[in-house]
Amino acid sequence: MNIQALLSEKVRQAMIAAGAPADCEPQVRQSAKVQFGDYQANGMMAVAKKLGMAPRQLAEQVLTHLDLNGIASKVEIAGPGFINIFLDPAFLAEHVQQALASDRLGVATPEKQTIVVDYSAPNVAKEMHVGHLRSTIIGDAAVRTLEFLGHKVIRANHVGDWGTQFGMLIAWLEKQQQENAGEMELADLEGFYRDAKKHYDEDEEFAERARNYVVKLQSGDEYFREMWRKLVDITMTQNQITYDRLNVTLTRDDVMGESLYNPMLPGIVADLKAKGLAVESEGATVVFLDEFKNKEGEPMGVIIQKKDGGYLYTTTDIACAKYRYETLHAERVLYYIDSRQHQHLMQAWAIVRKAGYVPESVPLEHHMFGMMLGKDGKPFKTRAGGTVKLADLLDEALERARRLVAEKNPDMSADELEKLANAVGIGAVKYADLSKNRTTDYIFDWDNMLAFEGNTAPYMQYAYTRVLSVFRKAEIDEEQLAAAPVIIREDREAQLAARLLQFEETLTVVAREGTPHVMCAYLYDLAGLFSGFYEHCPILSAENEEVRNSRLKLAQLTAKTLKLGLDTLGIETVERM
């Protein structure tokens, strides 16, 4: 149920009947304050200006044509021409009933699209670090939301599995295997990469061998391809452990590494030359873009092939966008890549559009995000100033959550405690990130994220168990409850019901903008409204069975909405805390 869409259409029709143009925007929004109703139509100002009349005069004319019979109990004009809409309690009650009768809580499915989501993208032969966290979990929340809405989502894990460093890594892997009688367990990927680099820098003979190996790998030699595959396998096996711990839906099947696009690169360079987009400049192949200017104010040159014949990230990104449209049949492509890559992506996409590889009708969207900072406001590092490994961060989250839940549940069994600590610890790390607007940097703070008050995972998980506990105490007959009507008489009942029915609107925003913090804010608000409702509208001690059952149904829809909302974020719920 999308009340905003329903009201927008009704107000738009009334505006047209009052003389507004057919493309007028009613600007129906959820009201910020209760006294302004549940929704507000703010579009009169802009349209009245075009029509040369006072906004309030237009609003009055719109009201004469606005039929919200059975939807609103009151409609009024406020200020210079805002239209405040108060939803009818009977309308709310009917739609709460419908939401409870549906597995999807009444959420409609929009027209199905094929959407490619590019996220996570770790590098081969390196351990995942905190810099990969935001892309991985924000991207996964977007994927879960889009899939719930019925879209065909293709996860694209753009792994860094190609480049000149692979000569050095294969040479080092070969040396290790010889010394360890062919047995090789790469437990410490970070150390492996560091040692390979040290040898490369200090041992000229080793460096020469590494350079030869790059050439052999790139020419398709089977032995070197096999060694390369081994490095990819070891890395992705380790990464999968991290994905599973994070409750992220990526699997090995979603890997679409840089190497996938290698065969396309020569053809793309040749095609861009043939189309007159790419030219030779100082031995390199360059595309000059008028949209981007260099320091001298001239069109910026974007290199797509170096003097030595090597390709660049831009070339791969051009091939990648082309592949996603032509081979994967994407109708929309979302990239969860940090904001520092913005210009690079815009340049690649400008070339993609000029070359006609992806039509303008297919959006390429950079859903960028800021950095994760320490309490000092600087990039999050270890005490020694090194990069924080993601596995270490999750270990610490688990350890802190164990202490926290053991303190609150001294009698809980070890198994239960471990499950609860896992849900709370991992949930806390994810929710702390997801609840912030992705476009900004955020401060990583253990105390805040593990707090049981405020907009945190522990608070949301606790809020969910609190609603469930009402049902345990009620000892209700599910069938009897399903048949009971919902009656809304109190203001707090109406406020809770209206917010519950805004779940679909929230999902729509997350799907459109790729902003999971909007879902977090909605769920936090919902938990707060339930708290006020629970305090002021007795459930188990209600004045009669009819009111008791109706309030139980509001509590039931609250629990289902909290659970489903947290699920779209990839946050686990628990039955007891």
From Swiss-Prot:
Q: Where in the cell is it found?
A: Cytoplasm
This entry carries the following GO cellular component terms, namely:
cytoplasm
UniProt key word Ligase: yes
Pfam families hit by this protein: Arg_tRNA_synt_N, DALR_1, tRNA-synt_1d
Q: Which GO terms describe its biological process?
A: arginyl-tRNA aminoacylation
The record's section on NCBIfam families has: argS
Assembly notes: Monomer.
What is the recorded name of this protein? Arginine--tRNA ligase
Record organism: Shigella dysenteriae serotype 1 (strain Sd197)
Gene that encodes the chain = argS
